[in-house]
Amino acid sequence: MAPQDTSPLSTQIEASGRPALPDVSLRITEALAFDDVLVAPAYSQVLPGSVDTRTRLTRTISLNIPLVSSAMDTVTEGGMAIAMAQHGGMGVIHKNLEIDEQAAQVRRVKKFESGMVVNPLTIHPDQTLADARALMNTFHISGIPVVERETGRLVGILTNRDVRFATDPALKVYELMTRENLITVTAEVHPEEARRLLHRHRIEKLLVVDDAYRCVGLITVKDMDKAQAHPLANKDELGRLRVAAATGVGEDGHARARALIAAGVDVIVVDTAHGHSAGVLAAVERIKTLSNAVQVIAGNVATPEGAAALIAAGADAIKIGIGPGSICTTRVVAGVGVPQFSAVLETAAVCRAHDVPAIADGGIRTSGDIVKAIGAGADCVMVGSLLAGTDEAPGEVFLYQGRSYKSYRGMGSIGAMARGSADRYFQQEIKDTLKLVPEGIEGRVAYKGPVSAVLHQMQVNARFRRITGAGLRESHVHDVAITREAPNYRQEG
């Protein structure tokens, strides 16, 4: 007897070359969206204020809150990434930017806050006031350690107070710098001791020196104040905020990944609409060879098989979700996808078996959906529309019918693909925007104010019970007002 063909329907071909007829014995399984389930209340001794929301983002990087902002051009750039990291999450800077510009956004986040500025910018005594001001203006700093040109030994510090009233750009640094009574510490100084020294001497910067009196770091009042204001901030081992950035497949994606790693990014996200594909698997494998320190998140997938393939390629976390987003039309336009609750439930099980974190990406409309996603097996969730109307999201606030809004669009919308995200949907070779096949729409969301107020509303855990059928609604555009229709999608009613 010939062995039974167990290959997927899409690969079963008759001898004539025509696709085989589907096996009528195949069972169509039920799949659930977030709206199909509710948390079943149960006895608890844990008060909401004592809930621990720490979780993993990747194999080696953790989060203090289970929230990640999505790599969308109306959601995450430097400002959102800073705010997310300060509150304990992480932001993924979108790739609809030139490579240099995206790398600059990463550097902005990494330099925004430091426990100690390692290897700070320095200047030599024989340089000029013009040189000093150029450094201060370019890097937005108010003080520069002065070191000997040959030995690197610390000889002074030049601050705004030293140069404020100087008018001759040819003046030498040694004529202006503060050289007496320099307050220095070693790299092992305790934060409380550093704060005490700053207060006692009424200064804003502590110079960190090594045994040879070379300047190896800088501790500033601003950074200490930021650390005190945001105790849950997600930081690396040097006290800098953590940040992720998106890239694509192919040579452009690889070049982008190299630039992002050079800029100091913590996590690279290989961001595509269909992660279970040869190009994505190859991209993950190549990026993993670039750095041992940088973690790689890959996606999106909605099946256990897709997750297993990405894990085998070396992915450090898996992004789950095809089509659940409020501005995504993939399921309707392409007829592809899995309702998000079931996708997370089934796919996260594979991730858990390999000790790889799972990220639920899309379909999160309320804090209750976060609870359901985490209970289904996700380690954290990626959100877009919930953050799109905040101050930190890119774009301006505009008035419509007397109310304030901000723009929000899917990365599969015509506008986003024309700007640079077409490769996410494997349409990068199409130059005529009229020939692009969009899988998202452009819309508006209500203005929400600072992101801190939104983040405050989202953190919990639990179990579920099915209640209703809501998969179709999740597959369609929801929770935004469409301002520009895609040519292949129209919502009736």
Regions found by a protein language model. Name each.
Residues 1-43, 123-124, 185-186, 196, ...:
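Alpha/beta catalytic cores of nucleotide-metabolism and tRNA/nucleoside-modifying enzymes
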Residues 49, 98-107, 167-170, 214-234, ...:
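Active-site-adjacent beta->alpha loops and helix N-cap segments on the catalytic face
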Residues 51-63, 70-72, 101-141, 146-149, ...:
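Bateman/CBS regulatory modules and CBS-like beta-alpha motifs in cytosolic regions of diverse proteins
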Residues 62-69, 115-120, 180, 236-246, ...:
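Short beta-strand/loop segments at the ligand-binding rim of alpha/beta enzyme cores
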Residues 79-82, 255-263, 296, 302-320, ...:
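Catalytic cores of alpha/beta
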Residues 86-101, 265-277, 316-334, 364-398:
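Glycine-rich phosphate-binding active-site loops on the catalytic face of alpha/beta enzymes
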Residues 92-96, 122-123, 143-145, 184-186, ...:
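Catalytic beta/alpha-barrel core
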Residues 95-110, 146, 151-167, 198, ...:
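Terminal amphipathic helices with adjacent charged low-complexity linkers/tails
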